[in-house]
Amino acid sequence: MTKLTARQQQVFDLIRRAIERSGFPPTRAEIAAELGFSSPNAAEEHLRALARKGVIELAAGASRGIRLLGGDDAPHQFTLPHAGLMQLSLPLVGRVAAGSPILAQEHISQHFACDPALFSSKPDYLLKVRGLSMRDAGILDGDLLAVQKRTEAKDGQIIVARLGDDVTVKRLMRRPGGIELIAENPDYENIFVKAGSADFALEGIAVGLIRSGEL
């Protein structure tokens, strides 16, 4: 791997940890807050330096458009699409009616063409986030969460799940006797789900985020 300065290594490691933990990279503002930079512009300068050294690639116009490139320290290797290749067409899911599939036609408000390089792996749909329970993970009301359909998830991953009649976005942690759905906002309570509960169904994992207004 190209030799980095101590500060550049801190930024690179922060990006790597964020992708390992949640499936998508941090925003410039999150990098600045975590590492004590005076502004997101300072984070941008370090990101551009890392891009010049060939260890990351930046996608213009996306707050989380950061991809780790190859190397022993990169947990994911992203392949950027060549110009002219077809983008992903992803359905946008709005409100989900109780008891019906998330991807039921009546839930899909529109489709978006998205650069596949924005995501840690290929998503199946975009879910419009409602509320601020995941605020401290950088997921805000109105954001579009890229979701890959899964029936299993690892500890620490951000998931989309059905809980009774509701669809929720939380961080999953296994506990004795069940799982805990962790809110990333102290104003919201975590939710414990007993093992085998008929009220719980995993719908997918987060593989990226598009800030409201970026599409």
Swiss-Prot record:
DNA-binding region: 28-48
Biological process according to GO: DNA repair; DNA replication; negative regulation of DNA-templated transcription; proteolysis; SOS response
Matches recorded under InterPro entries: LexA, LexA-like, LexA/Signal_pep-like_sf, LexA_DNA-bd_dom, LexA_repressor, Peptidase_S24_LexA, Peptidase_S24_S26A/B/C, WH-like_DNA-bd_sf
CDD domains recorded: S24_LexA-like (cd06529)
Keywords attached to this entry: Autocatalytic cleavage, DNA damage, DNA repair, DNA replication, DNA-binding, Hydrolase, Repressor, SOS response, Transcription, Transcription regulation
Active site, renumbered: S133 (for autocatalytic cleavage activity), K170 (for autocatalytic cleavage activity)
A GO MF label: DNA binding
Site (Cleavage): A98, G99
Known catalytic reactions: Hydrolysis of Ala-|-Gly bond in repressor LexA
Enzyme nomenclature, EC number: 3.4.21.88
Record text on subunit structure and interactions: Homodimer.
PANTHER family in alphabetical order: LEXA REPRESSOR, LEXA REPRESSOR-RELATED
Family according to the record: Belongs to the peptidase S24 family.
Free-text function comment from the UniProt entry: Represses a number of genes involved in the response to DNA damage (SOS response), including recA and lexA. In the presence of single-stranded DNA, RecA interacts with LexA causing an autocatalytic cleavage which disrupts the DNA-binding part of LexA, leading to derepression of the SOS regulon and eventually DNA repair.
Protein name: LexA repressor
Gene for this chain: lexA
